Every structure is written in structure tokens, then in C-alpha cells.
Amino acid sequence: AFLRFDYSGHGASSEVFTDGCVGDWAEDAQAAIEVLTQGKQILVGSSMGGWISMLMAQRLPDRLAGLVTIAAAPDFTEDGFWASFNEDTRRLLLQEGVVNIPSDYGDPYPITKRLIEDGRSHLVLRKPLSLPFPVRLLQGDEDVDVSVELANTLFSHIKGPDVQLRLLKGADHRFST
């Protein structure tokens, strides 16, 4: 059996994306694991879900048997969005509370001040990340959203007895090519 769900504000959920943040989505995941599953779980997280899975590994290590990430995007609010914003964009975000950034997947992404600020409370690459179970990091070499360099950084950062990085030739961010 497996459990799949959409974070609040994502996919088929009824909430609005701009109302959420990393902490909220981590709470969604933790509640789903604690309420809807029994025994040890293998988490599979793609992109932001990879980051959330790492937060679950820190919060619920005794409930996990393994972790698989696909194009994991840990700390993307800080190292991706905030780091790439110029001074004008940062000022606009702080004043208006939201900026819209272009997306290759449809409508622009509304990035909120709350998303950026809350993300800073959940960064996983700035402190030790010990994962005592098997970890498989899957990364496409044609991913333009999460670089192979970030996958290598994550691989080097994780401490554990069984951590592997698998680079897939020709795969994009969504592993659709």
C-alpha cells in the first residue's frame, strides 16, 4: 500500500498556494504519516517534496525505513528564490508581500514574503543531516530547475550508512523526458 497526497495549495487540494509555506507543508506531511500510516515508511519526494521528506526524516526518524528523492530542492526558498532576486525584487517582496516569477510550467509563481521567511526556519543544508536508513537521490542531468551541482552538494551533506546519488541521463526536472 502507499499514501499519496497534495500539500495544501498544491494539486487538487482546496487551499490557496499563497496561503502556505514550507512549515505548513511539513505539518501536512507529518499529519499524513502519523494519522494515515502504520509502521516504518519509505518516503518518496519530488522537488519541494524532497525537502519536505528530509524534514520528515529529521522529525520522524523512527517511522522511516528509507528515503527516495527525485530532483530534490532543499532550501530553494533561500538558495533559489531569495539568492536570485535583485535588490528591486527583494524590496518589492518586502513591501508588497508577494512577487510573481516566471514559470516554465504555466502561470507565474507567486512567491510570498511568508514563504521566504518561513523557509529560513526549515533549511536543511546549513546543519548536519544524518539519515540512518537507505537514501537514494535521483537527479536528471537535463534538469534546469535543480542543478546536478545541488544534487552533489546534498549527497555530500547527508551523513548515513547507505546514501547513493543516481544521475539519470536525459531526465528533466519532472523526469518526463
Language-model regions, residue ranges each:
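Conserved alpha/beta-hydrolase
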Residues: 1-12
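Alpha/beta-hydrolase active-site loop
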Residues: 19-36
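Gly/Ala-rich beta-loop-alpha elbow adjacent to hydrolase catalytic centers
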Residues: 45-49, 53
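Hydrolase active-site cap/lid region
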Residues: 62-111
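Active-site nucleophile elbow and catalytic-triad environment of alpha/beta-hydrolase enzymes
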Residues: 108-128, 133
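Short beta-strand/loop motif that positions the catalytic acidic residue
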Residues: 131, 137-139, 143
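Conserved alpha/beta-hydrolase "acid-adjacent" motif
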Residues: 144-150
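Catalytic histidine-centered segment of alpha/beta-hydrolase-like enzymes
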Residues: 171-177
